[in-house]
Amino acid sequence: MSYQPQTEAATSRFLNVEEAGKTLRIHFNDCGQGDETVVLLHGSGPGATGWANFSRNIDPLVEAGYRVILLDCPGWGKSDSIVNSGSRSDLNARILKSVVDQLDIAKIHLLGNSMGGHSSVAFTLNWPERVGKLVLMGGGTGGMSLFTPMPTEGIKRLNQLYRQPTIENLKLMMDIFVFDTSDLTDALFEARLNNMLSRRDHLENFVKSLEANPKQFPDFGPRLAEIKAQTLIVWGRNDRFVPMDAGLRLLSGIAGSELHIFRDCGHWAQWEHADAFNQLVLNFLARP
């Protein structure tokens, strides 16, 4: 029987999660039926979702025999919105912990992009026994860069888009989001803009969260040595959102880690170099 590609609608699920005395309705996609589970955590861009972030990576993982969970973090996608005044990544980690507990999944491999990478580190530091392998892609430690002024130009444009969600600002952000912009079609811009504007509460609450606590992503650098999981770090040589030296900091801090850098690549390695990225990850996950 030939493989049937996964669809967003067929894999869409919801669970209720208790957080700080409130009940949040959390959306995720549940794909495949493998014995091992890979959780994919998206970045913090306006309009981001688990499915949109990893659309080019889901089928290869499922076809290789993995169960794949794509979480919409609170404040993104179809999940409930929230104003967060603490560590955003620890919040995301707690939400994920509740979801995998309710799904009765004992151990997961974590693959996180940008904010999702930082959240994956938070989850691993809090519940190391629940993590198999770790893939961190363009997700920094929360610390400062040695070579690039902070915030980076990418983060400045991202924050501008949150405050003024227009097609012009979206194109300004995406223009430096990827290295080769020729794949950025009008249809992609339209879909992303519609995604953003359909949940203005997410946009407004992200800005309120930054005002309540500008340091949403604390520096995990001093704790990286606690991570014992085998870790694959992936970066774009031309990333203008999270500087490449953040990847070197992860490599230095996590003993069981290795770093792969894609040339001609921005902040979205899993999309810009999908075939090579998928093979890299599958080979890493298959290793003993």
From Swiss-Prot:
This is 2-hydroxy-6-oxononadienedioate/2-hydroxy-6-oxononatrienedioate hydrolase. Signal peptide: none annotated. One of its GO terms (molecular function) is 2-hydroxy-6-oxonona-2,4-dienedioate hydrolase activity. Catalyzes the cleavage of the C5-C6 bond of 2-hydroxy-6-oxononadienedioate and 2-hydroxy-6-oxononatrienedioate, a dienol ring fission product of the bacterial meta-cleavage pathway for degradation of phenylpropionic acid. HAMAP family: MhpC. Pathway: Aromatic compound metabolism; 3-phenylpropanoate degradation. The record marks R192 as: Catalytic role in ketonization of the dienol substrate (substrate destabilization). Its EC number is 3.7.1.14. The record marks S114 as: Transition state stabilizer.
